[in-house]
Amino acid sequence: VLALIDMDIVCFRAASSAESEAFGIAKSRCQDMLDGILGKVKATEYRAFISSPSNFRKDVLPTYKANRTAVKPVHLQKLKDYAIKKMGAEMSPEGLEADDSLAIFQKEQGTIICTIDKDLLQVPGHHFSWEISGKGWKRPDLFLEQTELEGNRLFFEQCIKGDKADNVIGIKGLGDKKARNML
């Protein structure tokens, strides 16, 4: 099994968890998270992707992700650089996000997308989303086989309702429920 890893998220979560720690702690947590994912999906190999510094979506929609104003974790960029130099991560092609690279390579046989990003569920194939938790809630590991039909439905649903996480405005008056019912 070839695991396709969203290394942006792995690095972000590791850096966030080590905000007041030394960089070595962030590196260790990043490696532990990657090893945990690879073990759970029984990967024989992996490709991990980091988003390109440029993003074609911002050329199309200048407000794309403009709502993300929080300060980035202190070790994030250094951890991404480390992941590329020492952990075998790859920089996505110019203008593309890690998500795009995962979607492109998911077309190969024997792959599994490994991310907690809901947008990748638009891509047919095998998916793994690792356990996440917050104050008073927990979502367990999730393995999913996504169909092309359901992936397309999710894509069009998002086109209708928009995506608050990425600051993409949908059709006025059409939210989650109406978009879901339309499709």
List each model region and its residues.
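Short acidic, glycine/serine/threonine-rich loops at helix termini
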Residues: A15-S16, V60-P62, V123-F128
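Generic alpha-helical propensity signal that fires on short helical segments
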Residues: E21-F23, Y64-A66, K138
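Extended two-metal-dependent nuclease catalytic cores across DNA- and RNA-processing enzymes
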Residues: N67-L183
